[in-house]
Amino acid sequence: MEASKVFFTNMRVKNGDNLLKKLDRLMRAAGIESIDFDKRFTAIKMHFGEPGNLTFLRPNFAKVVADLVKEKGGIPFLTDCNVLYVGKRTQAVDHLNVAAENGFSPASCGCPVIIADGLKGTDEALVPLEGTTYVKEAKIGHVIMDADIVISLTHFKGHEATGFGGALKNLGMGCGSRAGKMEQHCSGKPEINTELCRGCGACKRACEQDAIVFDAEHRAHIDQEKCVGCGRCLGACNFHAVYSPNYVALDELCMKVAEYTKAVVQNRPCFHISIVMQVSPYCDCYGGNDMAIIPDVGMFASFDPVALDAACADAC
């Protein structure tokens, strides 16, 4: 099998040039113009950020992608699905308001924003899968499956459950409906080693499900009925008290993400872009972000999301 090609450009610019022009050249060099966009609905899958988080990709990058699609006769729109955990993006009204607050609009991006799984995160398409280990029928946001073409535009960063968040995470977890996200997360919920717990409350502050309770000795415990397995408490604890009781479950999560990605990309044209800048240790779903853990690396593009993730990880 021939190795997939991944194209790269660094973040350096000369006078008269800029990163937006470099992104346009990168996409063309990687072969995006080989896709027939004419009169075809093109979903640009990205993350609109959580209020207070400033590491999500700027709307300017989305506009470059949308403008190229329109140049080729396509009909682009920006999209994401609602999230599982409690926050500002669990339903489409708040989600659209967050996108607007963070600068994503037809005026700034040249195309509309559509929440792919509808008002309450229940508008899903059931996509049958063959040859998979865990997922036999993926629950994907209906708008994603209605699109003729999918382009993933990903902020590559760390992630507390999957190690890093790249194209596969953006496509697999990101395109899942709320029920689809639950299916991916549900195999592994964290627990707390009370001997290591300091009672600091960091895990409780990170939990938006109100699933953390304290006993008489002020040791934390997780209410498994309320827990959705998002893993935020894992990243919040500085004392290694929060852990996965079954590390195979994290492997299973990653495999489910990959299988959900297969449901999204199979049987239609797809193209993938990852931007490795402001690499925060955790995902952009938090209402804040830590400083970058490495210097900015560059921008990558490929028709193969697996090769793209591998290249980004290797470059870090």
Question: Where are each of the predicted segments found?
Answer:
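Extended, low-polarity segments enriched in aliphatic/aromatic residues
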Residues: 2-61, 71-80, 85-316
